[in-house]
Amino acid sequence: PGIEERTLRAMLSAEGLRGVVLETFGAGNAPTSEWFIRVLEEAIDRGLIVLNVTQCRGGRVMMELYETGLRLQRIGVLCGHDMTTEAAVTKLMYVLGLELPREQTLDLLRTPLKGEFTD
């Protein structure tokens, strides 16, 4: 809340940035402003990986549950299920460090490797 379009756009355009962890509300809901979705979609279209995790202490991301999560899913945001923020950052760093083709990278992020999330 409170972030402006130019700030988000600048953050997602940082040189060398390949992935981000998006901490969302509850079951994976983010702001619904058109500009917010558009900026995320543009970043994903440029190849940025966005991994959605909940900022709640318990629970999980279920992007199909509410319209706001569905919008994120439709533009290519990945579901972090019940991964903690720390696990998501670590996994993203590890998988991106493998320097694999994009589809393999996305497949690894969608698959539990060491129990970091439950299906």
Predicted regions and their residues:
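A broadly conserved detector of short glycine/acidic/proline-rich loop/turn motifs that flank catalytic sites
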Residues: 1-3, 26
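C-terminal accessory domains and tails appended to enzymatic cores
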Residues: 3-14
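Active-site catalytic microenvironments in core metabolic enzymes, especially phosphate/sugar-handling
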Residues: 12-119
